């Protein structure tokens, strides 16, 4: 008969239990170590994603100034703005005491980053199918890659967003684009493309056409060709089942469907009148670039809610450099911005500057603030002036859901200045784009 050694069984059970407990203890403590490491690693990841700029005077543009305020950024977006903001312990903190903190500036009209040879297509005078983003060369404008793409000369003036246009040497040059002035990749840099259709009235296209021995050379012929193009696009829209694609007509359809606006460069009274007539006839959204004589139609522009992008007024005061073909870029009188604003017209300033082989190499990022300061000196209210180079500019470009003011959820494009933004003595000390520090004053 088999005898059972109960004492041995009890001893074995106790031994197995101790071993099991030891194993569980080891697993438990190892888990704690792993959890601790994961927590530390997660906190490390958050550092740099959370930014707090505290102690400075914050100008949110969309609201009142906040003295001794805090601007909180999380994952590249504005998280909070105020005077009693709790700063997370894992945040990168910059003390801006004695500084001004405001949204990054927007230059609403440039040819920056485009080689002059790529600005104007001379094969034909009307080319709506062309996209300037294809000629955009950030490595040439922003410094050789690979690596960060930075427009240092623009960043030094606090400019974080620009509109780039095809050249104004043809009647209809093509589709413009909106880009940031610093990014890690090209795709990250682009905000919108296409963003508008660029058209030029005045004598400049005619001069180029004479040189190329082609038509049109007169304004009446140029406008006639524009109207023919619009009418052809309307007919194309009514026959969308046509199996033959037409890239130029597809591009024009974006205008007729009001998916993008037309930006018409018009300075003389007659050209501004023509621009408004075209917009009325073909029912597209209109932005006038240049607008040197826009106060001639100030009431009508206000009634039609047409925005004006004024050219630079500061260049003659500061630079001894002569701009070729000045007649094509007439100096806007210093009080025009104030008069347009008073009439209820949305106004922004554009540098109309070139990045590679500029016609006016003295025009860099600082000029946008200088133009704004001059407008203040001639009667435009300071808050309206600051808005014209931030939120109003963003509204004109239809990107105010992303940039232009410190509102929760918008891109954290931020500049820190060492004084009054409208003082010529003030310098931009730091620039952040999407919450990332991209420029510091040397």
Question: What label would you give each PLM region?
Answer:
Residues 56-59, 395, 407-442:
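C-terminal cap of metal-dependent C-N hydrolases
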Residues 117-118, 123-131, 136, 261, ...:
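His/Asp/Glu-enriched, well-ordered alpha-helical/loop segment
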Residues 279-285, 302-309, 344-346:
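Glycine-enriched alpha-helix->loop->beta-strand junction motifs that scaffold or abut catalytic
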Residues 58, 62-102:
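Histidine-rich, glycine-flanked metal-binding segment
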Residues 99-171:
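Metal-associated gating/positioning segment near the N- to mid-region
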Residues 155-286:
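Polyanionic/metal-chelating signatures
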Residues 1-27:
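N-terminal secretory signal peptides that target proteins for export/translocation
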Residues 29-43:
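Bacterial N-terminal signal peptides
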């Amino acid at each position: 008969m088999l005898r059972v050694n109960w004492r041995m069984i009890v001893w074995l059970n106790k031994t197995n239990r101790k071993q099991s407990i030891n194993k569980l203890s080891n697993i438990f403590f190892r888990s704690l170590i792993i959890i601790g490491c994961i927590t530390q690693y997660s906190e490390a990841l958050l550092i740099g994603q959370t930014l707090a700029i505290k102690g400075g005077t914050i100008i949110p543009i969309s609201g009142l100034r906040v003295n001794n305020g805090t601007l909180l950024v999380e994952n590249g977006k504005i998280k909070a703005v105020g005077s009693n903001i709790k700063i997370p312990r894992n945040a990168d903190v910059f003390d801006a005491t004695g500084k001004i903190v405001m949204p990054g500036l927007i230059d609403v009209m440039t040819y920056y980053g485009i080689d002059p040879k790529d600005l104007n297509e001379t094969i034909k005078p009307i080319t709506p199918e062309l996209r300037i983003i294809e000629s955009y060369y950030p490595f040439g404008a922003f410094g050789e890659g690979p690596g960060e793409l930075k427009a240092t000369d623009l960043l030094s003036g606090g400019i974080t967003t620009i509109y780039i246009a095809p050249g104004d040497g043809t009647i209809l040059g093509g589709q413009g684009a909106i880009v940031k002035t610093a990014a890690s990749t090209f795709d990250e840099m682009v905000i919108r493309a296409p963003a508008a259709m660029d058209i030029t009235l005045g004598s400049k296209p005619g001069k180029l056409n004479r040189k190329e021995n082609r038509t049109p050379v007169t304004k009446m012929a140029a406008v006639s060709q524009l109207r023919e193009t619009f009418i052809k696009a309307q007919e194309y829209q009514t026959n969308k089942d046509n199996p033959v694609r037409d890239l130029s007509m597809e591009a024009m359809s974006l205008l007729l469907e009001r998916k993008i606006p037309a930006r018409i460069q018009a300075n003389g009274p007659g050209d501004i009148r023509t621009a408004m007539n075209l917009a009325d006839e073909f029912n597209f959204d209109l932005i006038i670039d240049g607008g040197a004589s826009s106060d001639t139609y100030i009431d009508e522009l206000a009634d039609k809610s047409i925005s004006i992008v004024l050219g630079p007024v500061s260049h003659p005061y500061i630079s001894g450099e002569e701009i070729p073909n000045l007649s094509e870029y007439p100096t806007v009188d210093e009080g025009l911005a104030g008069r347009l604003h008073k009439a209820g017209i949305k106004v922004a300033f554009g540098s109309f500057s070139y990045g590679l082989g500029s016609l006016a190499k003295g025009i860099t990022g600082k000029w946008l603030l200088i133009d704004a300061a001059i407008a203040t000196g001639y009667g435009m209210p300071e808050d309206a002036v600051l808005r014209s180079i931030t939120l109003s500019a963003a509204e004109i470009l239809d990107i105010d859901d992303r940039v232009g003011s410190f509102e929760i959820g918008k891109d954290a494009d931020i500049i820190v200045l060492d004084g009054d933004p409208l003082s010529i003595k003030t310098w931009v000390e730091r620039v952040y784009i999407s919450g990332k520090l991209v420029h510091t004053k040397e």
